[in-house]
Amino acid sequence: MKLLLLTLTVLLLLSQLTPGGTQRCWNLYGKCRHRCSKKERVYVYCLNNKMCCVKPKYQPKEKWWPF
């Protein structure tokens, strides 16, 4: 029983200490970063003041407004 409690405690501490990776954005297609890679573009900004880096194929197409 003590071993089980110790194992659960260690797993809980490890899950709090190591983040799961970068925050996701734009319907889980983008990642919040300080800088985007060459193959990505900024479309929106994340809540943590980082850029939401999204590959161009996942960004919406620009539509021209008819006048």
From Swiss-Prot:
List the GO terms this entry assigns under cellular component, sorted alphabetically: extracellular region
Q: Note whether Cell membrane occurs among the keywords.
A: no
Single GO BP term: innate immune response
**Mind telling me which InterPro entries this protein's record contains?**
Beta-defensin, Beta_defensin_dom
Tree of life domain: Eukaryota
Q: Does the keyword ATP-binding apply?
A: no
Q: Which UniProt keywords apply?
A: Antibiotic, Antimicrobial, Defensin, Disulfide bond, Secreted, Signal
Q: List the disulfide bonds.
A: C25-C52, C32-C46, C36-C53
Location within or outside the cell: Secreted
Tissue range of expression?
Abundant expression in the male reproductive tract only. Expressed abundantly in testis, while expression in epididymis decreased gradually from caput to cauda.
Q: Which residues form the signal peptide?
A: 1-20
Name of one Pfam family that matches: Defensin_beta_2
Return the similarity comment: Belongs to the beta-defensin family.
Main role?
Has antibacterial activity.
Q: What is this protein called?
A: Beta-defensin 123
